[in-house]
A protein has these predicted regions:
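Active-site-proximal cap/loop segments of hydrolase catalytic domains
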Residues: 1-143
Length: 143
């Protein structure tokens, strides 16, 4: 089974791959939030309260805390100009995966923001990357 998502959906993709590796074999996380405590506090606190009032919730919702569970194929996609989920937040996950010796793929679009829509052809490139990754790593037909 393959899964992909953008933003919060990217975080759900990471959680699915990391926590249910026997169920999810391929995932594409586009501009995910792997460390919610570093994400925009005003947005995060609407749904989760403050970190001080809900430490357990923040720990349980943070994909980075479950990265050791990765067994399948993972593609992480972001933009270096990201102002929503800053690239440093995603690089924290990338660094953790490297430290765990996990194999994964990583695509950074230069100077692109959360929508990855800046620059001629970027969105087409992103969509083609997603399609190609799924086709190469999750081919159709019985196994």
């Amino acid at each position: 089974v393959g899964i992909w998502g953008w933003s919060g959906g990217g975080s759900n993709t990471l959680n699915a791959l990391f926590r249910k590796p026997s169920d999810y074999h391929v995932g594409i996380a586009v501009v995910p939030k792997p460390q919610p405590h570093l994400y925009n506090a005003w947005f995060q606190e609407i749904y989760m309260g403050t970190r001080e009032s809900n430490e357990a919730g923040y720990q349980q919702s943070a994909p980075i805390n479950f990265a050791e569970g990765l067994k399948g194929k993972l593609l992480i996609v972001t933009g270096s100009g990201e102002t929503n989920t800053h690239i440093q937040i995603i690089e924290g996950l990338v660094d953790r995966l490297i430290g765990l010796g996990k194999k994964f793929d990583y695509m950074v679009y230069p100077n692109r923001n959360h929508g990855l829509s800046e620059g001629a052809g970027t969105l087409v490139h992103v969509r083609m990357l997603i399609a190609r990754y799924l086709l190469e790593n999750l081919p159709p037909g019985p196994r």
